[in-house]
A protein has these predicted regions:
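Acidic, glycine-rich active-site loops and adjacent beta-strand->loop/helix elements
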Residues: 14-17, 42-47, 85-87, 183-185
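Flexible, active-site-proximal loop/turn residues at the rims of small-molecule/cofactor binding pockets
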Residues: 44, 74, 159
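Short, well-ordered secondary-structure micro-motifs
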Residues: 50-51, 92-94, 165-166
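Claisen-condensing/thiolase-fold acyl-transfer catalytic domains that form or cleave C-C bonds
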Residues: 1, 5-8, 12-34, 129, ...
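Short, surface-exposed connector motifs at secondary-structure boundaries
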Residues: 144-149
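Flexible, glycine-rich active-site loops centered on histidine and acidic residues
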Residues: 29-65
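Condensing-enzyme catalytic core mediating Claisen C-C bond formation in acyl metabolism
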Residues: 54-126, 130, 134
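Structural motif
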Residues: 8, 36-39, 66-68, 77-78, ...
């Protein structure tokens, strides 16, 4: 639909962190000087991995996608800094038991419903609030930013309780935190670009 020709692309899979991973990669590709424009599309088909008999997860997830375009510029705008980490210690709190190379799909794994997303909400909540807050504080300290300098916080849309707790922990007014999970659900990789699209007129 965009009429693009002679372009190349690739897929990345990192679940809820996928858009940030792609943003980091796209930013560095542009900074290398070899690329002028990059389109990042974020989205997941969460309904295909949601167990509708599990009331802990089925109301949380939704399908959605959006994209952004990165462009080289000489202006003092754009992605100025980033802070990324990965921690596999909480794997058992949020995972899909089968479907990968460790446990290949079989008739038995499907019958046992091992291809659905499983999570322990309380542990995910604690982990998310702590690490999301630490990430914001790290970036702010590294760039000499105060809460007055921050126009918006754009968090992953896991649930409203997490976003509210993060805002309280870092002492940022809740009205500065973008929220769309209340009507779009958790669309995984799609949450951040969907927030940017929905709040575009207010940026």
């Amino acid at each position: 639909n965009l009429g693009l020709k002679n372009c190349w692309g690739f897929d990345m899979e990192a679940a809820c962190a996928g858009f940030l991973y792609a943003l980091e990669m796209g930013t560095n590709m542009i900074c290398s000087g070899r690329y002028k424009r990059i389109i990042i599309a974020g989205g997941d088909h969460m309904s295909s991995m949601t167990n509708y008999e599990d009331r802990n997860t089925c109301p949380i997830f939704g399908d959605g996608s959006a994209c952004v375009m990165l462009e080289a510029t000489t202006e003092d705008v754009g992605v100025m800094d980033s802070f990324n980490r990965v921690d596999g210690k909480g794997y058992e709190f949020l995972h899909m038991a089968a479907g990968g190379s460790a446990q290949m799909p079989t008739h038995e794994t499907v019958d046992q419903k091992l291809h659905y997303c499983y999570q322990e909400g309380r542990n995910v909540f604690k982990h998310a609030v702590t690490n999301m807050s630490n990430a914001v504080e790290t970036i702010a300290k590294r760039n000499n930013l105060t809460n007055d300098n921050i126009a918006w916080i754009v968090p992953h849309q896991a649930n409203v309780r997490i976003e509210t707790a993060v805002a309280q922990r870092i002492n940022v007014p809740e009205e500065k935190v973008m929220v769309n999970v209340d009507h779009m659900a958790n669309t995984s990789t799609g949450t951040l670009p969907l927030c940017l699209w929905e709040y575009e007129s207010r940026l």
